[in-house]
């Protein structure tokens, strides 16, 4: 009994000492609140990708193409994803598109949400121009809500502007929305720039009419540009209306390359930014797209001046712009020719199979 009594007293005093010590520790090391602002810092990944007639099965069964895109999305994890040159989804009897009805949902199920379950939704799409191809915008519905869209141009193809808003944790109480406008396009291809110059110039004129000042805005897609002195490119970065000039991040912000630029004539000077082609040989893995390896920089993401301001709610993260899968050594090589350490080999193979185009991506910071 003496042993048990002594043991009990020892445990009692240990318990008291622990209880006394606990408040002291809390006072010595103040606990920071888990959340100091309703808007936590965040990073938004923005990606534009020409998917080469995705939907018409020219490159292979849609289920197979879904699996390639699933691999790419699982790696890149975009929060805003623009797919351009999707085979048009028929919405009427006179539409030219050959994608199956409901193909946008099929992309969600078989590719995007298969990679990241429950994450993605898509915006409304149009094809008033009755083109064979169209653009689809997807977004991370855990970070953004869809507000509205407008068709800005319907010439050869539709160019739509989408209005998204950031999902503030306190949005239901404050009703304070931070909008982000995304213009997604695929201009006319070909060596003669007249059609694409007209499309982009009309787009810029429409933007000027819409907004008394440029909001948080991105213009992205496949511009089919050969050089920076084309009228369409100049309409974006050097518009006659000085308050409506956009930035091409590798040039204007990161200063990695300089104007004037002609990647058609000197691709080696822009090797890490080239987006056409992922394939060295024309008929491999299929004959649905161009070969010739990396030679053209058709795909861009332009940002409004507000997004270049580090104090803005949305702001470009310097040097985040990059071409996924392009390590700068693709001038005479396919994307999956080794060595290429810019992405895992499985992703490189998926890029090779999915399209003859490389995707481009940048990151936006989100600050309280």
Residue ranges and their predicted role:
Residues 37-46, 139-146, 156-187, 364-368:
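Beta-strand-turn-beta hairpins that frame and shape the catalytic cleft
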Residues 57-60, 92-97, 148-151, 175, ...:
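Short, solvent-exposed loop/turn and secondary-structure capping segments
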Residues 4-11:
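Sec-dependent signal peptide recognition
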Residues 209-217, 225-368:
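Metal-dependent phosphoester-hydrolase catalytic domains
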Residues 51-56, 86-90, 127-132, 142-145, ...:
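Solvent-exposed loop/turn segments at secondary-structure junctions
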Residues 51, 60-76, 81, 104, ...:
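Extracytoplasmic, non-cytosolic globular domains
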């Amino acid at each position: 009994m003496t042993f048990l009594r002594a043991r009990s007293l020892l445990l009692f005093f240990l318990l008291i000492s622990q209880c006394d010590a606990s408040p002291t520790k809390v006072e010595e090391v103040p606990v920071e609140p888990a959340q100091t602002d309703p808007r936590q810092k965040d990073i938004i990944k923005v990606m534009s990708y020409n998917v080469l007639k995705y939907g018409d099965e020219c490159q292979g069964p849609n289920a197979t193409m879904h699996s390639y895109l699933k691999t790419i999305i699982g790696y890149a994890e975009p929060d805003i994803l623009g797919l351009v040159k999707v085979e048009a989804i028929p919405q009427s009897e006179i539409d030219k598109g050959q994608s199956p009805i409901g193909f946008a949902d099929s992309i969600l199920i078989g590719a995007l949400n298969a990679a990241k379950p429950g994450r993605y939704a898509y915006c409304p799409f149009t094809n008033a121009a009755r083109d064979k191809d169209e653009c689809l915008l997807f977004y991370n519905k855990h970070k953004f809500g869809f507000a509205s869209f407008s068709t800005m141009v319907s010439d050869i193809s539709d160019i739509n502007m989408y209005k998204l808003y950031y999902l503030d944790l306190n949005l239901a109480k404050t009703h304070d929305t931070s909008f982000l406008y995304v213009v997604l396009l695929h201009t006319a291809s070909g060596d003669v720039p007249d059609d694409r110059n007209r499309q982009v110039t009309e787009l810029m004129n429409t933007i000027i009419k819409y907004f008394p000042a440029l909001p948080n805005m991105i213009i992205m897609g496949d511009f089919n540009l050969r050089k920076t002195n084309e009228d369409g490119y100049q309409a974006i970065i050097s518009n006659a209306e000085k308050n409506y000039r956009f930035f091409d991040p590798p040039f204007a912000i990161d200063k990695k390359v300089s104007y004037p630029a002609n990647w058609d004539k000197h691709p080696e000077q822009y090797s890490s930014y080239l987006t056409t082609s992922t394939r060295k040989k024309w008929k491999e893995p299929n004959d649905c797209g161009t070969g010739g390896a990396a030679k053209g920089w058709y795909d861009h993401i332009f940002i409004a001046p507000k997004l270049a301001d580090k104090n803005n709610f949305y702001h470009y993260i310097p040097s985040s712009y990059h071409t996924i899968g392009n390590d700068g050594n693709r001038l005479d090589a396919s994307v999956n020719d080794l060595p290429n350490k810019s992405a895992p080999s499985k992703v490189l193979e998926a890029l090779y199979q999915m399209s003859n185009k490389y995707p481009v991506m940048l990151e936006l910071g989100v600050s309280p």
